[in-house]
Regions:
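Short alpha-helical "recognition helix" segments of helix-turn-helix
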Residues: 39-44
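Residues within the DNA-recognition helix of helix-turn-helix
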Residues: 54-57
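Short amphipathic alpha-helical boundary/capping segments
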Residues: 10-19
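Intrinsically disordered, low-complexity basic tails/linkers immediately adjacent to helix-turn-helix/homeobox/MYB/SANT
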Residues: 68-92
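Key DNA-contact positions within bacterial/archaeal DNA-binding proteins
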Residues: 49
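C-terminal flanking helix
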Residues: 59-66
Length: 97
């Protein structure tokens, strides 16, 4: 479950601006504010299924963009490369000192 939550957070961080205002709002309330589908539905006067549909469409849209661009995957690769460079720099500094 933790990996799913992380994945959803990364998708929203990278691609959230591509969503409609309604998709952003429902997605944020569900994943970040931890509101249930029923709570969101009650607040907006729509059905629980309506809220779920908006969130599922938002997830699908962001996943589709990631599947085409692989930006998040490349971000993680670069993070690993940066960590390796940082470790190498630390080792060099230790040798010099």
């Amino acid at each position: 479950m933790k990996n799913q939550a992380y994945r959803m957070a990364m998708l929203f961080d990278f691609y959230g601006d591509l969503l409609t205002d309604r998709q952003k709002e429902f997605y944020d309330l569900y994943y970040n504010e931890d509101l249930s589908l029923a709570e969101i539905a009650e607040n907006y006067g729509i059905s629980r299924q309506g809220v779920r549909d908006v969130i599922v469409r938002a997830e699908a849209a962001m996943t589709e963009v990631e599947d085409k661009t692989h930006i998040i995957r490349r971000f993680h690769q670069m993070q690993g490369q940066i960590a390796a460079i940082d470790q190498a720099a630390d080792r060099l500094l230790q040798m010099v000192n």
